[in-house]
């Protein structure tokens, strides 16, 4: 496994997770 692709995958996971947390906070959950 390439370290660059692994870093990109981790970045996308963190980004989508934080984005969903922001959406949850805005909707009042």
Curated annotation (Swiss-Prot):
Record key words, sorted: Chloroplast, Electron transport, Membrane, Photosynthesis, Plastid, Thylakoid, Transmembrane, Transmembrane helix, Transport
Native organism taxonomy: Eukaryota, Viridiplantae, Streptophyta, Embryophyta, Tracheophyta
Compartmental location: Plastid, Chloroplast thylakoid membrane
GO biological process terms held by the UniProt record: cytochrome complex assembly; photosynthesis
Pfam families referenced in this protein's UniProt entry, alphabetically: PetN
Function, in words: Component of the cytochrome b6-f complex, which mediates electron transfer between photosystem II (PSII) and photosystem I (PSI), cyclic electron flow around PSI, and state transitions.
A Gene Ontology molecular function term of the record: electron transporter, transferring electrons within cytochrome b6/f complex of photosystem II activity
Subunit structure: The 4 large subunits of the cytochrome b6-f complex are cytochrome b6, subunit IV (17 kDa polypeptide, PetD), cytochrome f and the Rieske protein, while the 4 small subunits are PetG, PetL, PetM and PetN. The complex functions as a dimer.
Membrane-traversing stretches: 3-23
InterPro entries for this protein: Cytochr_b6-f_cplx_su8_sf, Cytochrome_b6-f_cplx_su8
The keyword Membrane belongs to this UniProt entry's keyword annotation: yes
GO cellular component: chloroplast thylakoid membrane; cytochrome b6f complex
Protein family membership: Belongs to the PetN family.
Protein's recorded name: Cytochrome b6-f complex subunit 8
Superkingdom of the organism of origin: Eukaryota
Annotated membrane topology: Single-pass membrane protein
């Amino acid at each position: 496994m390439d370290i660059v692709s692994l870093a990109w995958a981790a970045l996308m996971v963190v980004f989508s997770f934080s984005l969903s947390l922001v959406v949850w906070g805005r909707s009042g959950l």
